[in-house]
UniProtKB/Swiss-Prot annotation:
SUPFAM superfamilies registered for this protein in UniProt: Ribosome recycling factor, RRF
HAMAP family named in the record: RRF (MF_00040)
UniProt source species: Shewanella piezotolerans (strain WP3 / JCM 13877)
Protein name: Ribosome-recycling factor
Keywords for this protein: Cytoplasm, Protein biosynthesis
Lineage: Bacteria, Pseudomonadati, Pseudomonadota, Gammaproteobacteria, Alteromonadales
Cited Gene3D superfamilies: 3.30.1360.40, Ribosome-recycling factor (1.10.132.20)
UniProt-listed GO biological process terms: cytoplasmic translational termination
Family: Belongs to the RRF family.
Predominant subcellular localization, coarse grouping: cytoplasm
């Protein structure tokens, strides 16, 4: 039972780190990256469809994304969806391809984005700590039911704390890399 609690905590903490990484990938840096457009939804035959299902996104150069739409009739809808997103991008249609130049980030915008990234990292840390709290309370419940000893509880809490420290360190590393990426000119 204790092993199940530890395994569950480890898995949930891994998911917290992945979620934080995904949230940070959505923050636009000055560099082109296809995942920047992952959240964009395009109206397609009456329903909203993720952009990557109606087009392929590739990197043109360091500051340009190319979107190749599979169905030429969708070019205008894809352009409109990109423009109406909160990313501040202005797509330009060039035949079957849509070019999206990424404007350079201003110093003020960079600082705002760093605040956003730090908030995401803190949310990730909080989620990891919540998993730790849940695991520790589950182990204490086992102790109350006399299914494990006090030593088992202490040992398990120490292991869960090590998991927590390792996962928070991963989040901090992701944050440091993203901050470095944002501050590059």
């Amino acid at each position: 039972m204790i092993n199940e609690i530890k395994t569950d905590a480890q898995t949930r903490m891994d998911k917290c780190v992945e979620s934080t990484k995904t949230q940070m990938a959505k923050v636009r840096t000055g560099r082109a990256h296809p995942s920047l457009l992952d959240t964009i939804q395009v109206p397609y035959y009456g329903s909203l469809t993720p952009l990557k299902q109606v087009a392929s996104v590739s990197i043109g150069d360091a500051r340009t994304l190319n979107v190749s739409v599979f169905d030429r009739t969708m070019i205008a809808a894809v352009e409109k969806a990109i423009m109406s997103s909160d990313l501040g991008l202005n797509p330009m249609s060039a035949g079957a391809t849509i070019r999206i130049p990424l404007p350079a980030l201003t110093e003020e915008r960079r600082k705002d984005l760093i605040k956003v990234v730090r908030a995401e990292a803190e949310n990730g840390r909080i989620a990891v700590r919540n998993v730790r709290r849940d695991a520790n309370s589950d182990v204490k419940a086992l102790e109350k039911e006399k299914e494990c000893t006090e030593d088992d509880v202490r040992r398990t809490e120490d292991e869960v704390q090590k998991f927590t420290d390792a996962h928070i360190k991963k989040i901090d590393e992701i944050l440091a890399a993203k901050e470095k990426e944002l501050m590059e000119f």
